[in-house]
Amino acid sequence: MEELFNALPQPLQQLSLALAGEIPLTDHIFEQAASTWHVQPRSLTYKLLDHIPFSTPVVVPPSIYHSLDWSKCFAVNQDRVERVPTIDDPDDVYVPNSDIGPLLTSLHTIPDYGFLHPAIENDATTLRAERARCASTFYKIASSQARQVKLDPIRMLGFLLLVQARPRVPSGLVTDQPTRRDPTQSPALHAIWQVMQYYKVAGVYYAPALVVPSGAIWWIPPPGKRNVVSVQYLLTDLINLAILAHMTDMSPTLELTGVLMYLRAASSHSHAYTLLQMKSVFPALSLRSMYRNKGFGGKAPAIEWTEPRSKYKFRWTGVTQLHDGLRPRSPSMDVPTLEVLTKYELVDIGHIIIRERNAHPRHNHDSVRFVRDVMALTSGMYLVRQPTMSVLREYSQVPDIKDPIPPSAWTGPIGNVRYLLPSVQGPARHLYDTWRAAARQIAQDPQWHDPLNQAIMRAQYVTARGGSSASLKFALKVTGIVLPEYDDSKVKKSSKIYQAAQIARIAFMLLIAAIHAEVTMGIRNQVQRRARSIMPLNVIQQAISAPHTLVANYINKHMNLSTTSGSVVTDKVIPLILYASTPPNTVVNVDIKACDASITYNYFLSVICGAMHEGFEVGNADAAFMGVPSTIVSDRRSSVAPYSRPISGLQTMVQHLADLYAAGFRYSVSDAFSSGNKFSFPTSTFPSGSTATSTEHTANNSTMMEYFLNVHAPSHVKSASLKRILTDMTIQRNYVCQGDDGILLLPHEAASKISADDMNELLTCLRDYGQLFGWNYDIDWSDTAEYLKLYALMGCRIPNTSRHPPVGKEYAAPQTDEIWPSLIDIVIGHHLNGVTDVLNWREWLRFSWAFACYSSRGGYTNPKGQSFSAQYPWWTFVYLGIPPILLPGQTPFIHSCYMPPGDQGMFSILNGWRDWLISHASTTLPPLRHNHPVWGLSDVPSLLSQFGVYAGYHAAQHYRRPKPAPETASSDSINQITSDLTEYLFYDSALKARVMKGRYNWERLSSSLSLNVGSRVPSLFDVPGKWVAAGRDAEKPPPSSVEDMFTSLNRCIRRPTHSFSRLLELYLRVHVTLGESIPLAIDPDVPQVAGADPANDDHWFKYTCLGDIPSATRNYFGESLFVGRVVSGLDVEAVDATLLRLKILGAPPEAFIAVLNGIGMSDSEAHQIAGRISLANAQLVQIARVVHLSIPSSWMTLNTGPYIHHHAYDFKPGITQPSAKSRDKSIWMSPILKLLCTSYAMTVAGPVRTSIVTEIDGSAAALSGNLRVWMRDV
C-alpha cells in the first residue's frame, strides 16, 4: 500500500519499515514514532483511510444515524431511575441508540467535544428532577459503554494501518507465506470510512467520542446532525473486526457477514441488546453445525484418558481416520439460527456462511480455520447496563421448584437447622446424604483442627478487595461496638485487610450482628454476556461460610471429577475437551441457567445446612473452630422433651449460616451511573462474592447429576440401549463440572456413537429432572465440546478469539483514571492472548510492536499543573515477552512467539546473537582491559549499551505502579494496624508458639559459623506486614508517589547499570547450540489448534513437534512440590524454592524444620515434609525455580515435558566440552541447564530442534559455585 505508506508521517514511516523487517528497530525510531502518535490529532488516523481505494460491496445505511428518544427509555420508579424496555422484552435494558448531543456542554480545551451539562447534573443530584436524573443516567451509561476499551479505538486502528502500510519482508523460513489480506478488500475498513463521512465537517473528521483516561467525551454536532451513541460502539466493533480479520487471514466474504450484523445492530433501537440476541449466531452456523453432509472424512487424534480418571492424565495414542460412520449425529443449528436472522433481516448472511461451510465437508486445517474465523465475527464488546437493572433483573428471580420438600420431611428444629427424616427419598435425600458424609469426614480429619489450616482458612479472604465495609461498621455500631480506625495508615478502608484488623480483638459472639449486615454492590461487565452484579461479603460472613467451603471442597476432591481442586486450565480442561470431542465419544455440554438464583434456602441450602450440622455431630462438641467457640443450642426434635446441648464451633458456624441463608441477603445498591439510585434490595439469590460460591455450585452440580445417572434416568427412560449405556456411567468417569458448567461424556458401544433417538430421550429426561428442584438445564448437544468457554471440535481446540478482543477491556467503575504505565501490562497481556489464540504470528507480532510503541510513552500532570513524562526503551518490551522482529546482523522474524519473558528470554536472544555481538564489538570498539566472564576482551557491554539493551532491561523491572511513600502514613497508625492484623492471624496461641520457635531456631542456625546458607527465609511473621503493604498499594496513590515513580523511572533509563542481573550474567556463561529437528510428535495433517497450520508456520511447527496433550503437566509444572497450602500472603512456590535452595546448599535437617515451623507447621508435619525433601524427588522445573527459571504460560498448551527430558542436553559427549560437565554433587545443575536449552530452542522460529550445551565459560564447577553464592545472598 504505497499510497497509505506515503500518507504516514515520516517517524511512523520509519516504524512501519522496522515492523516490516526492513530495518532494525532502534530507540530513536521507537521514541520518535511514539512522540508523533501522542501529539498528532486522532482524527488524522481516519484521514489515512482516504488513501485506500476500497472495492467492497459494503453500503452503510443512513439508519445508523437515526435516534431513539432517550427520554422514552428511562423513567423514575420508586425513586429509582430505571431503564424502560422499548420493545416487548424485559431484557431490553441496555444503552439505547440515542442522540447525546443535546445533553453536552463544550470543553474549554477541545471545544468540538463536550461532557454532560453541569446544569443537568445539578438538577439531578440537588433537585432530584426526574428528567435530569434520567438524562444523567443515559449520559453516564452511554459513556461507560464507550469506555470498555484498552484505549481509544482510533489508536488501535492506527496500529493496524501502520502494519498494513508496508508488507513485511520474507523471513527466510521456507514455510513463510505472505499475508493474503488486502486493505482495499476489507469490508470492515470500508465501513469505517463510510461511517466517518457523516462525521466529516469542513474536511476534518470528528470521532463520535474520544476515550480519555477519565472516561469518554462526545462530539458536539453542528446543526442538522446528530451524535447517536451507538455509532461509537459500531466503530469499536468494526475496528476490532478489521484487526482480527487481518490477524486470522479471514476471507473478505466472511468479514462482510460480521460487518452486516454490526450495521444491523447500529440501525436497531439498541446496539448492545441486538448483538446480545444474536451472540450465538456465528458459533451455531459454524462450530455447532459442521460436517453434517455426506463425504465426511479427514484425521482426528486418538486420545486416551488413562485410569484412574481422577488423575486427569491424557495421552495421544495415534490417529483416528474419520468416515461417515463417525459423522456428527446431532442436528445442525441452521433452522433456529436462520429464524433469528430472519427476525433481524439478516438471513442472507446465514446463507453465505452455510454455503462457505458446505465447502468444508472434511475435517482438516482449512475447515477448523473456517470455524475459528466465523466465531471471530461475534462482537467482542464488553456489554454495559445500568447496575440498578442488573440487580432488578438478576436478583429478583425465584426458582420454580416442581417437587418441593414438604414441611413433614423435616425433624423439629435444632436451633436454626432441621435434619431430613430418613424416610424421605429422591434427589433431596441424595443431596443430604452426600453433604452429611462429607461433613463427617471433615469433622473427623485432624488436619482441619490444626491451627495452621484454620489460619489458612481465615486468611483466604483477607485481600485488598472490597467487602461491604460500611455495612459491617454500621451493623456493629447499632449494637454499641465501635470499630477502631487506622486513617493515617493509608490502607484502603474498603478492603477486607482493613476489616480483618478492625475485628481482630473482638470476640466472635460480639460480632454476630455483622452476619446480617447488608452487602454492597459490585459490578462486572462481560463479553457476549449480560453484565452481572456481585455481592462481596464482609469478613464475618465469609468466616461463617468456611464450613460450606470445606465440605464442598471435600466433595469435589474425593467424590466427583470436578476441575476446581487445584487445577489450571491447561492442566485439565484443554486435554479434557480435546478428548471429549474426539469420535466416537459423544459429549453434551451442560449449563445451569441462573445458578446463583437457583440455590436458595427453600431447597438446597436448608438441606445442606442440616446435613452439615448432622455430619459435624461426630466431632468434639466442645471444640472451637477458626475462633468461633462452642455454644449451647436448643434441640427440639422431640416436641415433648426439648433440651439444650452443646455444639461445636463448626456447628455454631452452620447455625449462623443457616440463619443468614434463611433470611436472605439485603443488597445495598448505590448506582454510580444513576443519580439518586440508592436503595436496599432483599434477595434469596446465593451470594456471588462468597468464598464458597464456586466450590459449592460444583458440589451440588455433581451430586445432582450423580442421582440422575444412578437412579432417576434408569427408572425413567424407555430405550433398552440407553438403559444399558447408563449402567456404565458414573460422575467419577462421565461427568466433569465446575460451578454451573458441566460436560457429560457418553460411552460409545463398539466404536459406534450413541443414536440420535437415545440422545434426545436422555436430554429430555435431564431437563425434566432439573425442574424437580428448580434448575433449568441449558443443554447443548452438537458434537462439540464447550467447557469454561473453551471449545473443541474433533479433538482440535478452536480458539474463541472474539472473547479476547484486541480493542475491548472491562471498566466497571464510572471513573477509570489509571496511571499510564499500567497500559504496558495491558500490551503484554494483549500480546499473549494472540499467541494463545494462535493468530498469524508475524502479523500479530508487528501489531503488538505498534501497540507497544504507543504505550511506551506517557505523562502525568499533578494538581499543581506540573507535568512529568517518561519514555520506555524498546528493549523493555523484549524483556517483558515480545520478541524482536530484526536485530543487527540477523534476518527478520527468526525469533519465535514462544520466546519466554524475563531473563530466560534475554538469555535466549543474547545466546543466538552472541557471535555477531562479539565480532562486531571486536571490530568497532577497543578491547576491554580485563577479561569479561561472558564476553572475554570484546567490549560487548558498551555495544549493548549503545543499542539501549541495558536501559530497556532495567526499565522493564522498574515498578509500574506508584509505591506508597512512607512519609504519607503515620508510623503509629501503621504499627497499630500491623499489630491488629498480627492478632487476627495468630488468634491461636499454639500457632504463634510454633512460629516463634521456628524463628528462634532459624536465627540460631543461620548465625552459626558452620552454616552458610543465607538468612532470609519465608515466615508467618512477615504476613501482617505484607497485608498492610497490599492494602496501601490498593489505595489511590497520592501525587507525590506518582511523581516519584516518574523521577525514578527516568533515572533508571538515563543512567542504567551496564550489566544484567547476577543470574542473567551467570546464565550467559552457558553456550547453547541447536541440532537436528526432533521427530514429529503428531501427524502434521491432524488439526490440533485452529490456525496452527502450514499458513501459520511457527505455531504449526511447535504443535506438531511437541503435541498439545500435556502428558506430564502436573508432574513437571505443578504449583507446589513439598508444601501444599500456605497462609495468604506467603508464596507457596517461594517456600518450595527455599527448601530446595537449602538442600542444594547442604543445610542440616533441623534447618528445614525451623523454616517449616516458621510458616506455622507443627513439628510432626515439619518432620514429615523435611524427610521428603530430596533433589531426586524434585522435578526439573521445580529445581530450576530456585534460580528463577520457569515454564512461561505460552508453553502450557504444549507437551514440553518430554522435550526437556529427552531433547535438551546439558552434556553430550563429542559436542559439549568436558569442563562443562557437572559433578555428581552438583547434579541440581542439570535441570537449570536443560531449561536454558529449552528456552533457546523455543525462542527460535521454525521446527523445534535438539538443544545442547556446548561449553560453559569458566567451567560447570565455577558456575555451580557462583550459583551457590547467589543462593546464599538471596
Swiss-Prot record:
Its EC number is 2.7.7.48. This is RNA-directed RNA polymerase VP2. It catalyses: RNA(n) + a ribonucleoside 5'-triphosphate = RNA(n+1) + diphosphate. Belongs to the reoviridae RNA-directed RNA polymerase family. GO terms for biological process: viral genome replication. GO terms for molecular function: hydrolase activity; nucleotide binding; RNA binding; RNA-directed RNA polymerase activity. It is an enzyme of class 2 (transferase). Keywords: Hydrolase, Nucleotide-binding, Nucleotidyltransferase, RNA-directed RNA polymerase, Transferase, Viral RNA replication, Virion. GO terms for cellular component: viral nucleocapsid. It holds the Pfam family RdRP_5. RNA-directed RNA polymerase that is involved in transcription and genome replication. Following infection, it catalyzes the synthesis of fully conservative plus strands. After core assembly, which consists in recruitment of one capped plus-strand for each genomic segments and polymerase complexes, the polymerase switches mode and catalyzes the synthesis of complementary minus-strands. The gene is S2. Signal peptide: none annotated.
